Structure formats: structure tokens, C-alpha cells
């Protein structure tokens, strides 16, 4: 892999991903940064590719960050979250019930059915299920978990699983549904949720979402230039605003990792990533 061009990996969860990275590629070229990207069908393939030295930077989901951090620890390497979006910070997930539901407290979910998104979705599955577990309800034991496992490997970036979970709730096939709070608003705007038909039962603690991940050994000058160009972007600049809108942000921020505590707890509870971590770590030997 050439160290003259910064090579980024991203997951193709939606056709707009090509528009986004073609746009950023053109912008970076105007700023003198040689940049290219590779699209992957799933985050596990992307994480493995980064540890195989095939990309310098990965645009990672929160679960892919946890995977990368743990593989790095297992192999004596260092992973760093260098940049994230303003919209990646301080998010919450919610557990929603129908307005006429007899469920008025988390404890009332015992013996009932909870619909979630994809099994690997931090926001629609792992974090809310861990939250319910911390409230004394063991998922799969104290209540039935109904998975809507759309596009595994995309870590819930494709929100179809959350949308299907809400529809199951509204049809009476589930007693509660889990989703990121922003999608509750989106589903209302789409007409999936009619006004007054649902209410929020509980809200998780805040957590963070995606970040750009680099490993030790990445070309420092290129990474620093990439980071500086991102952090210098202004939403007031009409040449870059459409790309920021597509990527869902108004400002890039320096990366931080304290916002992944809730997901780390969920991963520890469910043991979700350990087989993959061991597999990639072994391949690095």
C-alpha cells in the first residue's frame, strides 16, 4: 500500500456512500491531499482489512471501533479515534410502547416481547438490551427478544431493522420496540408512527457513535493533514455543505472514546465480538 495517498475504508450501507466519498475525494484533492477510498460490504471485512494493512483510516461504526480497539490490545498495537461528527456525540436510545399499553415501567416488560433491530446494531439492540439487563431484566430469559436482523455486518447503519421493529410494535406483535431516539422522530415524519400512537417507556444513558479509526503505523503526515482538513471544514462553506448534509453533520469534532462505555458494557454482557476479535488477532500473528 502506497504511503503517498491516504486510503480510507468505508462500509457501503447506502448508495449515497459513493456520492459522499467521491465528493470528499474531490475536495481533498483541491486541498493538496492525495486521497482514495475502498468500500466494504460489512464492518468485519473493513476491520480485518485495516489490520492487514490494506487501508490507513477506517470510517467505523461504534461496534467496529470496539472490535478494532480489542484486536489492537490483543496484538500489541494501538487504535486511535481521531475524528467524529457532532451528531455522533451524546446520543440516546429509547424503548417505546404503544400509547394504550399496560406497560408503564421497565419492570412491566417481564414476560413480554421486545422488538429490536439487527443483532449487531449498537443503538437498536446491544445498548438498549444491556440497559434493560442493568434494570434487572435478563434479555431472552425475563422477556422475549424479537430480532429484525436486516443487513447483518452493517451494524445497524441501515435502519430497516428499527423500522420493522416499530411496525411489529404497532401491529401488536411486540410489546415494546428499541431504537435510537432520532429514528423515532424520523419514523413519525415518514408516517410509520402516527401521532399519539406510541410513548417512550425509558431512555438509555448517552453514548457516542461513529469515528475515523487509525492504527499505529499509519502515515503520520497524511493522517494529520486528513484530520486537519476535516476539523477545518465549515458548514457555512457552500462548496462543502452538501457533503456534510449527506454525511449528517454540521461540524467535525476531535475523536473521543469515553462515549463508548455503554457499548463496551453491552459487548461484555453478551460476548458479542470475542470470536471475531480472536480470529483477526490470530491472523495478525
Feature-to-residue mapping (PLM):
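Short, glycine-/small- and polar/acidic-enriched structural segments
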Residues: 2-103
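Flexible hinge/capping segments at coil-to-helix
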Residues: 97-114, 118-119, 135, 139-141
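A ligand-binding cleft/hinge motif common to bilobed small-molecule-binding domains
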Residues: 59-74, 133-134, 163-195
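Hydrophobic residues within well-ordered alpha-helices
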Residues: 50-51, 109, 169-170
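Periplasmic-binding protein-like
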Residues: 3-10, 77-94, 142-158, 187-227, ...
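Short helix-initiation/N-cap motifs at beta->coil->alpha
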Residues: 37-48, 140-167
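Secondary-structure junction motif
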Residues: 117-133
Amino acid at each position: 500500500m502506497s504511503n503517498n495517498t491516504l486510503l480510507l475504508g468505508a462500509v457501503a450501507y447506502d448508495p449515497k456512500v459513493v456520492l459522499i466519498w467521491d465528493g470528499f475525494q474531490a475536495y481533498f484533492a483541491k486541498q493538496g491531499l492525495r486521497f482514495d477510498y475502498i468500500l466494504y460490504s460489512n464492518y468485519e471485512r473493513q476491520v480485518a482489512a485495516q489490520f492487514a494493512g490494506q487501508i490507513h483510516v477506517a470510517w467505523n461504526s461504534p461496534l467496529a471501533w470496539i472490535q478494532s480497539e480489542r484486536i489492537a490490545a490483543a496484538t500489541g498495537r494501538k487504535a486511535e479515534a481521531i475524528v467524529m461528527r457532532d451528531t455522533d456525540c451524546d446520543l440516546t436510545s429509547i424503548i417505546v410502547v404503544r400509547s394504550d399499553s399496560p406497560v408503564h415501567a421497565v419492570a412491566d416488560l417481564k414476560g413480554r416481547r421486545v422488538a429490536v433491530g439487527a443483532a449487531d446494531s449498537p443503538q437498536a439492540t446491544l445498548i438498549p438490551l444491556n440497559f434493560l439487563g442493568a434494570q434487572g431484566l435478563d434479555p431472552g430469559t425475563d422477556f422475549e427478544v424479537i430480532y429484525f436482523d436486516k443487513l447483518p455486518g452493517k451494524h445497524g447503519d441501515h435502519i430497516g431493522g428499527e423500522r420493522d421493529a416499530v411496525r411489529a410494535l404497532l401491529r401488536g406483535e411486540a410489546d415494546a420496540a428499541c431504537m435510537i431516539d432520532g429514528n423515532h422522530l424520523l419514523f413519525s415524519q415518514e408516517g410509520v408512527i402516527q401521532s399519539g400512537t406510541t410513548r417512550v417507556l425509558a431512555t438509555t444513558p448517552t453514548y457516542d457513535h461513529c469515528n475515523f479509526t487509525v492504527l499505529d503505523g499509519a502515515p503520520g503526515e497524511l493522517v494529520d493533514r486528513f484530520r486537519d482538513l476535516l476539523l477545518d471544514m465549515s458548514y457555512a462553506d457552500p462548496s462543502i455543505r452538501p457533503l456534510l448534509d449527506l454525511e449528517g453533520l454540521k461540524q467535525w469534532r476531535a475523536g473521543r472514546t469515553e462515549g463508548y462505555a455503554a457499548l463496551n458494557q453491552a459487548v461484555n454482557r453478551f460476548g458479542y465480538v470475542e470470536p471475531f476479535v480472536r480470529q483477526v488477532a490470530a491472523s495478525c500473528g
